[in-house]
């Protein structure tokens, strides 16, 4: 447990970094850091990397390991955070070789382009179903009505859940999404988080037991088969790999849809261009630009396994690097006119899916979800318009998304 002095330093640093003003527009601060302090050691002992080249080096260098969750001991005590840490230590994103290699090989099999292509009819059905529910109203909150439930319902089908269970999945994500940015949440959601984790564990344990007897073509069945081969070594790996797949695949896709749609409305030329050419290639190019321009995930973390030289500085063994993906994506040394939304941008190698050994496994699924969501919304709602020109952003440390996005059509 860290000392009260350390807790105070953390609280002061975080309150300055992650207030409402920062959440509304973090990019001026990113520019300042990139220009003046591109590799900065903070008062709480974390290094901040904001240049594209440095971020790529950290992500690709295998000496930088998955973030050591014990570093969270430096943050003020939070029962919800503690419960999440205990669960997520089993998730692939916080594992290192050989466990990471074993788990990634398993998960990559299911999220391959061929498998995801087969999911497209169901993903399209979910998008149409959600829009059917709001079409007669003439208005909607894109976040509440579409962007929030859409990826949850897709992932529930990926897992092999019944339609009747989807509302329960949505409730879990409302609860478990809170401690993903624990240092800025107003209250400690410990009781609710513990209960949600217990419910998730029970649900996926029961679903796995059913799939052992009655396998299907879903992710839980693949995990059960892997368990039989020894590729999954514990019940915790199965349960919490499923839980983290939900968490990682939900929040990021929700933010991609919300952030991207807001970017279109604030750049009417881009919106007009996409409406005139809604081809899959055009939408896919636009999606990459949405991801670069306003990344759903702003930061990721790595831990040095040994002393590592980075841009003339030494990152000591055991210290942590905060890789600011959102800052790297606006680096003028890598991107021409980085603060401009250009949905035809060539050579758009953004870092919103991170990179290296821990590059996002769900990238293919996320892009298919995004393409179907934008194509369907723009096709079915040609008069779509922004109802609130200044929607509120959720205050957050690592994720960037809107609280709501009211639209009329």
Region annotations inferred by a language model:
Residues 1-409:
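Cytochrome P450
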């Amino acid at each position: 447990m860290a000392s009260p002095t350390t807790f105070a330093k953390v609280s002061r640093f975080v309150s300055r970094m992650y207030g409402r003003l920062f959440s509304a527009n973090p990019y001026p601060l990113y520019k300042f850091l990139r220009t003046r302090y591109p590799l900065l050691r903070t008062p709480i002992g974390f290094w901040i990397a904001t240049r594209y080249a440095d971020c790529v080096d950290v992500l690709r260098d295998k000496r930088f390991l998955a973030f050591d969750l014990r570093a969270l001991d430096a943050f003020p005590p939070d029962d919800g955070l503690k419960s999440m840490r205990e669960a997520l230590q089993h998730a692939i994103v916080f594992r290192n070789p050989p466990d990471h290699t074993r788990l990634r090989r398993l998960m990559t099999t299911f999220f391959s382009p061929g498998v995801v292509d087969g999911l497209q009819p169901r993903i399209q059905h979910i998008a149409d179903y959600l829009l059917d529910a709001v079409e007669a109203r003439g208005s909607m909150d894109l976040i509440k009505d579409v962007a929030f439930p859409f990826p949850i319902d897709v992932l529930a089908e990926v897992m092999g859940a019944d339609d009747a269970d989807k509302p329960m999945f949505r409730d879990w994500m409302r609860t478990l999404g809170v401690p993903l940015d624990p240092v800025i949440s107003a209250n400690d959601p410990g009781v609710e988080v513990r209960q949600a984790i217990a419910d998730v564990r029970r649900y996926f344990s029961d679903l796995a037991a059913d799939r052992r007897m009655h396998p299907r073509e879903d992710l839980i069945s693949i995990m059960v088969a892997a368990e039989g081969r020894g590729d999954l070594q514990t019940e915790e790996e199965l349960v919490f790999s499923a839980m983290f797949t939900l968490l990682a695949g939900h929040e990021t896709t929700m933010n991609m849809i919300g952030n991207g749609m807001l970017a279109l409305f604030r750049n009417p030329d881009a919106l007009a261009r996409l409406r005139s050419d809604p081809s899959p290639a055009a939408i896919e190019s636009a999606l990459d630009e949405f991801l670069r321009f306003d990344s759903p995930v702003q930061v990721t973390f790595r831990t040095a396994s040994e002393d590592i030289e980075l841009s003339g500085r030494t990152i000591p063994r055991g210290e942590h690097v905060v890789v600011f993906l959102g800052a790297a994506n606006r680096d003028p040394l890598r991107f021409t006119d980085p603060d401009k939304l250009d949905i035809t941008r060539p050579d758009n190698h953004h870092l919103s899916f991170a990179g290296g050994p821990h590059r996002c496994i769900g990238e293919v699924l996320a892009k298919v979800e995004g393409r179907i969501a934008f194509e369907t919304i723009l096709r079915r709602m040609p008069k779509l318009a922004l109802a609130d020109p200044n929607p509120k952003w959720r205050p957050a440390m690592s994720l960037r998304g809107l609280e709501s996005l009211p639209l009329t059509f």
